[in-house]
């Protein structure tokens, strides 16, 4: 058979598949009244994957105009039902464990990165216990102790990094924030011993491990692709580093080399069934902590600095807020930051809050349907063949809740503070917290999988931003306005390159 016949048959088969797909969609809309509307698509299996992947929010808003808040689209062959709005967030993120499951969706992606038997590679009840174990580093006392550590990391970085040589220059702010936040996460959530190991080798390992969070790994986490081979090698090496620390401490009587730290805490933890936390799981939890503590802070920190560079007047407002609201030393200068200072810096926190509203790093939260789910107030029943998708960022970007929603305006929060009903407070087993789903603003998720590091994230970012603003001014480079677009090619969205901004030292200008 000639190549022309092969091509002809292939084209014929492709055309037939499209025709059958169109017939299926017609029949689906005509007879499946108990299912949400299906987003129109030409190519089977691919479905709406490309439109969704290129710009998820554009996809969500355009589909909402056509189909309403509830619709289904095909994501690489998988029927994915989206339910937008606060009711959708409640339905999906507060779904019962017997009805919706996060582990089945995320485990193939996260387990090769974090390791086995932690996070999504274990029953939810075990994850709840693991969250309780790490609250050691998120307690009030711990947060208070974190402030000087974070400030020192930023000051040392400004003094030692070639990015900030001299009195003025330019910097790739996304790269700089990635470095700063891995150092602050290391100092605070990991401890002195691990922080001392955050050298070039560790940075390379972290980078290779991070590449495991690529969208293709939702489907092919086992594929022998170059980035997966590097991911697996990096995980093995990073785990070995933690195991080595643990072994040395056990021989020395379980003592940290400096102040008590997370590893020492985890070495003393025991599950409810009486089983001590295995060393392997300690190592995997430490890897998870490092990546969780750095990922969102790095992305949001980059967006904050890009926004500030685009509006230098806000940079000066932040600096003046510190001068006006914080105590001074005898010579009139600002003293080192303390935990008590944070509450006296409302504009700093509003800058973070507003940036989280516009630039959340996770646009989609997924759950596998385990039992047929009737949607209250609708004729729809979601079958077990579907995955549910919640997009809390949609309400955060809606004029309905935030007038002129696409504008970055930290001052909007002076009259629009986020509220959480006391009736929404629930304890999933690791401390009382808000379910949060009734709010249109959910930058840290909601329900039992809500991020427990919210207070740390605000603290970390507030201290980083306050310290940078004390020492530097920022501005866009000549000819540039606004901020870059969003890169959705990674699982954790961030700013598109280039992300270079200008800076100058305050002391240099005042001199």
Swiss-Prot record:
<keyword id="KW-0349">Heme</keyword>
<keyword id="KW-0756">Sterol biosynthesis</keyword>
<keyword id="KW-0752">Steroid biosynthesis</keyword>
<dbReference type="InterPro" id="IPR036396">
    <property type="entry name" value="Cyt_P450_sf"/>
</dbReference>
<keyword id="KW-1207">Sterol metabolism</keyword>
<keyword id="KW-0753">Steroid metabolism</keyword>
<keyword id="KW-1133">Transmembrane helix</keyword>
<dbReference type="GO" id="GO:0016020">
    <property type="term" value="C:membrane"/>
</dbReference>
<dbReference type="InterPro" id="IPR002403">
    <property type="entry name" value="Cyt_P450_E_grp-IV"/>
</dbReference>
<dbReference type="InterPro" id="IPR017972">
    <property type="entry name" value="Cyt_P450_CS"/>
</dbReference>
<dbReference type="Pfam" id="PF00067">
    <property type="entry name" value="p450"/>
</dbReference>
<protein>
    <recommendedName>
        <fullName>Sterol 14-alpha demethylase resB</fullName>
        <ecNumber>1.14.14.154</ecNumber>
    </recommendedName>
</protein>
<keyword id="KW-0503">Monooxygenase</keyword>
<keyword id="KW-0560">Oxidoreductase</keyword>
<dbReference type="GO" id="GO:0016126">
    <property type="term" value="P:sterol biosynthetic process"/>
</dbReference>
<comment type="similarity">
    <text>Belongs to the cytochrome P450 family.</text>
</comment>
<feature type="transmembrane region" description="Helical">
    <location>
        <begin position="3"/>
        <end position="23"/>
    </location>
</feature>
<comment type="function">
    <text>Sterol 14-alpha demethylase; part of the gene cluster that mediates the biosynthesis of the tetrahydropyranyl antifungal agent restricticin that acts as an inhibitor of CYP51 and blocks the ergosterol biosynthesis. Sterol 14-alpha-demethylase plays a critical role in the biosynthesis of ergosterol, the major sterol component in fungal membranes that participates in a variety of functions. ResB acts as a self-resistant CYP51 that contains mutations found in CYP51s isolated from azole resistance strains and that is not inhibited by the final product of the cluster, restricticin.</text>
</comment>
<dbReference type="InterPro" id="IPR050529">
    <property type="entry name" value="CYP450_sterol_14alpha_dmase"/>
</dbReference>
<dbReference type="InterPro" id="IPR001128">
    <property type="entry name" value="Cyt_P450"/>
</dbReference>
<feature type="binding site" description="axial binding residue">
    <location>
        <position position="451"/>
    </location>
    <ligand>
        <name>heme</name>
    </ligand>
</feature>
<keyword id="KW-0408">Iron</keyword>
<dbReference type="GO" id="GO:0004497">
    <property type="term" value="F:monooxygenase activity"/>
</dbReference>
<keyword id="KW-0443">Lipid metabolism</keyword>
<keyword id="KW-0479">Metal-binding</keyword>
<dbReference type="GO" id="GO:0020037">
    <property type="term" value="F:heme binding"/>
</dbReference>
<keyword id="KW-0444">Lipid biosynthesis</keyword>
<keyword id="KW-0472">Membrane</keyword>
<dbReference type="GO" id="GO:0016705">
    <property type="term" value="F:oxidoreductase activity, acting on paired donors, with incorporation or reduction of molecular oxygen"/>
</dbReference>
<dbReference type="GO" id="GO:0005506">
    <property type="term" value="F:iron ion binding"/>
</dbReference>
<keyword id="KW-0812">Transmembrane</keyword>
């Amino acid at each position: 058979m000639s190549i022309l016949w092969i091509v002809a048959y292939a084209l014929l088969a492709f055309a037939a598949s499209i025709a059958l797909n169109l017939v299926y969609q017609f029949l689906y809309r005509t007879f499946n009244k108990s299912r949400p509307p299906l987003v129109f698509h030409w190519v089977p299996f691919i479905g709406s994957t490309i439109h969704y992947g290129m710009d998820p929010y554009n996809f969500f808003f355009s589909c909402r105009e056509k189909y309403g808040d509830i619709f289904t689209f095909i994501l690489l062959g998988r029927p994915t039902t989206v339910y937008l709005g606060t009711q959708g967030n409640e339905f999906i993120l507060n779904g019962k464990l017997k009805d919706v499951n996060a582990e089945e969706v995320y485990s193939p992606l996260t387990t090769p990165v974090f390791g086995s038997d932690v996070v999504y590679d274990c029953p939810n009840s075990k994850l709840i216990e693991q969250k309780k174990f790490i609250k050691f580093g998120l307690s009030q006392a711990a947060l208070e102790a974190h402030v000087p550590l974070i400030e020192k990391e930023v000051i040392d970085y400004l003094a030692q990094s070639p990015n900030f040589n001299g009195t003025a220059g330019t910097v790739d702010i996304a790269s700089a924030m990635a470095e700063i936040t891995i150092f602050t996460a290391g100092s605070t959530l990991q401890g002195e011993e691990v922080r001392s190991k955050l050298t070039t080798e560790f940075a390379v390992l972290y980078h290779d491990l991070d590449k495991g969070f690529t969208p293709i790994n939702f489907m092919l986490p086992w594929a022998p692709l170059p980035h997966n081979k590097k991911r697996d090698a990096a995980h093995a090496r990073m785990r070995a580093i933690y195991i080595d620390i643990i072994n040395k401490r056990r021989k020395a009587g379980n003592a940290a080399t400096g102040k008590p730290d997370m590893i020492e805490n985890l070495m003393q933890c025991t599950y409810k069934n009486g089983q001590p936390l295995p060393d392997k799981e300690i190592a995997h939890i430490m890897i998870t902590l490092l990546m969780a503590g750095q990922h969102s802070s790095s992305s949001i920190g980059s967006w904050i600095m890009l926004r500030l560079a685009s509006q230098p007047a806000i940079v000066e407002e932040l600096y003046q807020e510190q001068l006006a609201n914080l105590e001074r030393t005898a010579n009139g200068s600002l003293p080192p930051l303390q935990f008590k200072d944070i509450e006296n810096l409302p504009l700093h926190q509003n800058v973070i809050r507003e940036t989280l509203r516009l630039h959340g790093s996770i646009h989609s939260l997924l759950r596998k349907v385990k039992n047929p789910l009737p949607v209250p107030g609708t004729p729809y029943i979601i079958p077990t063949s579907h995955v549910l998708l919640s997009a809390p960022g949609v309400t955060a970007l809606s004029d309905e809740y935030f007038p002129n929603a696409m504008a970055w305006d930290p001052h909007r929060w002076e009259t629009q503070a986020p509220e959480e009903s006391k009736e929404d407070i629930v304890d999933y087993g690791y401390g009382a917290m808000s379910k949060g789903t009734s709010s249109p603003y959910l930058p840290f998720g909601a329900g039992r999988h809500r991020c427990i590091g919210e207070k740390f994230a605000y603290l970390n970012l507030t201290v980083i931003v306050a310290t940078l603003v004390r020492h530097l001014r920022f501005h866009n480079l000549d000819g540039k306005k606004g901020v870059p677009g969003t890169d959705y090619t990674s699982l954790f969205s961030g700013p598109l390159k280039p992300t270079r901004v200008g800076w100058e030292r305050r002391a240099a200008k005042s001199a």
